[in-house]
């Protein structure tokens, strides 16, 4: 998840980020870095591979760097040879399709060269628009040059790729389309800031009333179905209290959005807080990091608590969230030993750092979220019942998209409008009519990825419309563009719907768990656990 960042108080507090790139990416870094100048000290380095490593090692002897941002083979090279964190820019599916759409306006013979592996999912794009699309992958610069020469010999006229690839393509006299977008680079800066927030927290002071701020509020919870109206009413009710809230819902239903809405609505109701910044909203995914790191993150540690601990120790997330809200995402995946420590903090309203002895009073509202059936986890001994009761004083269940059928078409239209507007393409009546004609397909799909999946699907549709703004949005077109809508959508029993939906997604990616997890917005470990749990449930039935 992306955390909203508040500006540091002065330059000494700022994280130090170095961007390492050449040619086109260097120029994009330069433009985007201006947006983050108030949040970090950003230094551009226009070098690659061994020259960059040599320069950076020499520079680190006298200067501090908290994170490096790089991309492609250059980024992988740096990551394998430097000890400081390297944030790798990876093109999104939207980036790839947008670059191919640009190339498709120039020629029907296109090559795409990507680092290490090709993209099998592009087959649908090729068939739908009758393009001659050849994919290649590379590891070294010599390898990349060979792939470019081979594409040219095969009659390919335009090449899509990263900076190294576009440079080599232009050297060979071919049209080059850069694959990275400003949005992807911007996200890399957010990721780098999140990384430095974790590694430099002991040097950051969070005065009362400042800290990490929310991005969403009650008005961002969209949908006019009865379920969503009831949800907004419940959030408004829960905002009258500071009691712990447990949010349950499937992947992609907006659990953090709901948590932020509760946080914002509560503090907006406080008269003494008018015209003041909201207290901190601090979020952590309990299933995304190891047990030892999660313990240090939540409770902090004293100097010398373990090998590699920082001088002076470090405040934990409970201390940082003092006076505000701590959001514990994927609480169902918290290891049992940490559940015991968390329960003690909630009961005593005080936290003791790892390696410390002095309790530190904390005033924190805890909102937790899970996609798991915690009642089942308790029965199987994987979740403490006393912690469950402490966390679930107030309970909020988010409806899956398939149960909000009245919202599906309006949301699809809204997401499609946004994606088209980003490319300066009008949302015409013919597009609206075509989307309406596809409503039966949209309503029949189970939407295992919920809102996130619908938004991604409409982004994909927008890319295709940017190439052909007046297609016939019929079943045949949708079959090629959105093949997942054609999966058998027979009714499933409530006890098997999650497992079957996961298997559908896994089958779509030919068993590739990494790709399926990325599509669903969960970790590969989480996907594995859910598949294992689903298989066990079905064998027990």
Curated annotation (Swiss-Prot):
GO MF annotations, alphabetized: ATP binding; ATP hydrolysis activity; cis-regulatory region sequence-specific DNA binding; DNA-binding transcription activator activity; phosphorelay response regulator activity
Keyword DNA-binding: yes
Keywords for the protein's UniProt record, in alphabetical order: ATP-binding, DNA-binding, Nucleotide-binding, Transcription, Transcription regulation, Two-component regulatory system
Pfam families: HTH_8, PrpR_N, Sigma54_activat
Residues annotated as domain Sigma-54 factor interaction: 221-464
Residue ranges for the DNA-binding region feature of this UniProt entry: 513-532
Swiss-Prot/TrEMBL GO biological process terms: positive regulation of DNA-templated transcription; propionate catabolic process, 2-methylcitrate cycle
Listed Gene3D superfamilies: 1.10.8.60, 1.20.5.170, 3.40.50.2300, Homeodomain-like, P-loop containing nucleotide triphosphate hydrolases
SMART domains given in the database record: AAA (SM00382)
SUPFAM superfamilies, per database record: Homeodomain-like (SSF46689), P-loop containing nucleoside triphosphate hydrolases (SSF52540), PrpR receptor domain-like (SSF159800)
GO cellular component, one term: cytoplasm
UniProt key word Transcription: yes
Binding residues annotated for ATP, in chain numbering: 321-330
Role: Involved in the transcriptional regulation of the propionate catabolism operon.
This protein's name: Propionate catabolism operon regulatory protein
Species in which this protein is naturally found: Salmonella typhimurium (strain LT2 / SGSC1412 / ATCC 700720)
Gene from which the chain derives: prpR
């Amino acid at each position: 998840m992306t955390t909203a960042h508040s500006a540091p108080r002065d330059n000494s507090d700022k994280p130090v980020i170095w961007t390492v790139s050449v040619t086109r990416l260097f120029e994009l870094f330069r433009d985007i870095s201006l947006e983050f100048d108030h949040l970090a000290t950003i230094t551009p380095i226009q070098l690659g591979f061994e020259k960059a490593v040599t320069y950076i090692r020499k520079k680190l002897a006298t200067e501090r760097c908290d994170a490096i941002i790089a991309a492609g083979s250059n980024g992988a090279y740096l990551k394998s040879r430097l000890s400081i964190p390297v944030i790798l820019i990876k093109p999104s599916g939207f980036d790839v399709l947008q670059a191919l759409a640009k190339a498709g306006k120039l020629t029907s013979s296109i090559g795409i060269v990507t680092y290490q592996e090709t993209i099998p999912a592009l087959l649908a794009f090729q068939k739908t628009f009758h393009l001659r699309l050849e994919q290649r992958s590379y590891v070294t610069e010599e390898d990349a040059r060979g792939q470019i020469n081979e594409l040219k010999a095969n009659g390919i006229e335009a090449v899509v790729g990263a900076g190294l690839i576009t440079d080599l393509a232009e050297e060979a006299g071919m049209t080059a389309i850069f694959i990275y977008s400003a949005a992807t680079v911007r996200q890399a800066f957010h990721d780098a800031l999140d990384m430095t927030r974790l590694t430099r927290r002991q040097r950051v002071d969070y005065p009362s009333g400042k800290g990490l701020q929310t991005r969403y509020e009650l008005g961002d919870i969209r949908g006019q179905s009865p379920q969503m109206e009831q949800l907004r009413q419940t959030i408004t009710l829960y905002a009258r209290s500071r009691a712990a809230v447990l949010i349950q819902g499937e992947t992609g239903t907006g659990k953090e959005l709901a948590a932020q809405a509760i946080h914002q609505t509560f503090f907006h109701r406080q008269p003494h807080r008018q015209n003041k910044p909201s207290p901190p909203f601090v979020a952590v995914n309990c299933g995304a990091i190891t047990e030892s790191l999660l313990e240090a993150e939540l409770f902090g540690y004293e100097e010398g608590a373990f090998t590699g601990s920082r001088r002076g120790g470090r405040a934990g997330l409970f201390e940082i969230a003092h006076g505000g809200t701590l959001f514990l995402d994927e609480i169902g995946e918290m290891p049992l030993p940490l559940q015991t420590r968390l329960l003690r903090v909630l009961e005593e309203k005080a936290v003791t750092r790892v390696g410390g002895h002095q309790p530190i009073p904390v005033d924190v509202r805890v909102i937790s979220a899970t996609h798991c059936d915690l009642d089942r986890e308790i029965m199987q001994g994987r979740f403490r019942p006393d912690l469950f009761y402490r966390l679930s004083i107030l309970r909020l269940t988010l409806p899956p998209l398939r149960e909000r059928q009245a919202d599906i078409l309006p949301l699809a239209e809204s997401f499609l409008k946004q994606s088209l507007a980003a490319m300066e393409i009008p949302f015409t009546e013919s597009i609206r009519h075509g989307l309406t004609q596809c409503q039966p397909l949209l309503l029949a799909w189970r939407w295992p990825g919920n809102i996130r999946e619908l938004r991604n699907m409409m982004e994909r549709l927008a890319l295709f419309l940017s190439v052909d703004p007046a297609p016939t949005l019929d079943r045949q077109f949708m079959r090629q563009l959105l093949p997942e809508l054609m999966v058998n959508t027979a009714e499933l029993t409530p006890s098997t719907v999650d497992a079957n939906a996961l298997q559908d997604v896994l089958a779509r990616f030919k068993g590739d768990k990494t790709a399926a997890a990325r599509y669903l917005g969960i970790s590969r470990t989480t996907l594995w656990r859910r598949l294992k749990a689903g298989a066990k449930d079905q064998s027990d039935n």
